Amino acid sequence: MGIVGNSEVRVDAFDKATGRTKYYEDLVPADALYVRIKHSTIAHGFVKSIDLSEAEKIKGVVKILTCFDVPDIPFPTAGHPWSMDPGHQDIADRYLLNRHVRYYGDDVCAVIAENEVAAMQAVRAIKVEYEELPFVLDAQEAMKDGAPQLHER
């Protein structure tokens, strides 16, 4: 008839109960590196300088990339980024790492480490100096003449 009221034998029950089932964490190669991102702590501005000295001392840190290390190659993030029709292409307004911070949480550095703990500790140890710029939090205010502009026209 149906499943309701009847015991159902799960095909994966034995493997799960005996520990043979492979989960995501079981599939990570032993030599895999971990990446964590340092996010901006301001809503709008420019990264003036980045102090990596303490972060680079952390055992297990392999490399730290900053917004000054990667090229400014813009890419779109949504919609039709690869459309051949210019009318359907989204604005290429994102960068891998950002010198011009446009929102709280924008990506400014990437830490590559041998383990997740080292990566997270290094992110916390990075010190970023910003030149803060004005911003608005209201859509109506953002449309007014003279409102702060996040993107170049």
Q: Where are the model-predicted features located?
A:
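Flexible, low-hydrophobicity surface segments
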Residues: M1-R153
